[in-house]
Amino acid sequence: MRHRKSGRQLNRNSSHRQAMFRNMAGSLVRHEIIKTTLPKAKELRRVVEPLITLAKTDSVANRRLAFARTRDNEVVAKLFTVLGPRFASRAGGYTRILKCGFRAGDNAPMAYIELVDRADSETEAAAE
């Protein structure tokens, strides 16, 4: 029985899922918008939002925790220097999911996941 087990399996084993979301979180922080399937986008929210909350208080301990979860110094630097101060006054809900149709090959529902206060100069074409 799978009672009270949260999160989606996404037809992957645990280590593959962990690596995939680590990479996707890094891409989202780096580019501020990415295109993926809708279930992955919904699950990615659960990974990225705590990272941004962590980045709101800049300390060595928090930077180490963020590095442990992303394994990327560039991402950690952007989290704490750009995104942490940007979302300092926001209590949560740092990401937005926009449905964008279905994938041509297998008709999978696709979505953009983006940071809410993203600069308008970047286009959605950059996400693809």
Curated annotation (Swiss-Prot):
GO terms for molecular function: structural constituent of ribosome. InterPro entries: Ribosomal_bL17, Ribosomal_bL17_CS, Ribosomal_bL17_sf. It comes from Proteus mirabilis (strain HI4320). GO terms for cellular component: cytosolic large ribosomal subunit. Coiled coil: none annotated. HAMAP family: Ribosomal_bL17. Part of the 50S ribosomal subunit. Contacts protein L32. This is Large ribosomal subunit protein bL17. Pfam families: Ribosomal_L17. One of its GO terms (biological process) is translation. Belongs to the bacterial ribosomal protein bL17 family. Disulfide bonds: none annotated. Keywords: Ribonucleoprotein, Ribosomal protein. PROSITE patterns: RIBOSOMAL_L17. SUPFAM superfamilies: Prokaryotic ribosomal protein L17 (SSF64263).
